[in-house]
């Protein structure tokens, strides 16, 4: 309620540690949603908020996807098919997010795409597009000052060019 009153319309339940709501992909236990976490997801959805699974453990992602009645988002991360990092989503999780009508944001840092090149970003986006459709993939930069990336926002044209080089149509890029 506090976050909603402050104007938030999307929130994640975890970051780098397990907490009273859910297990983090970076946590010690990496558990699923707690009973309180289940209540929070239901309350967020009742208010029209979007649940972000970006730092959730695999068990947490599975629990959220089972409960979801609204689109779920992974705001920033990668995909296992192109970068086998623990935090990245596997194909079943990608399909699960898409089944909610949700969106997967592809990050720009090495742990998301195993490299910092625009071509690696495009490769991950191409995988999601091929698996579930362009409407379920987006850029998920995570420009927060703590993430090391190859380029700043003034160089986003490099990502656009990489998308063109990877075969994305103008309509896909605008989607």
Q: Residue ranges of each PLM-predicted region?
A:
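Extended, charged catalytic domains and RNA/DNA-binding interfaces, predominantly
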Residues: 1-107, 111-113, 117, 122-129, ...
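Short acidic/histidine-rich active-site segments
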Residues: 107-108, 132-153
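Mid-to-C-terminal alpha-helical segments outside catalytic/metal-binding sites
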Residues: 151-175
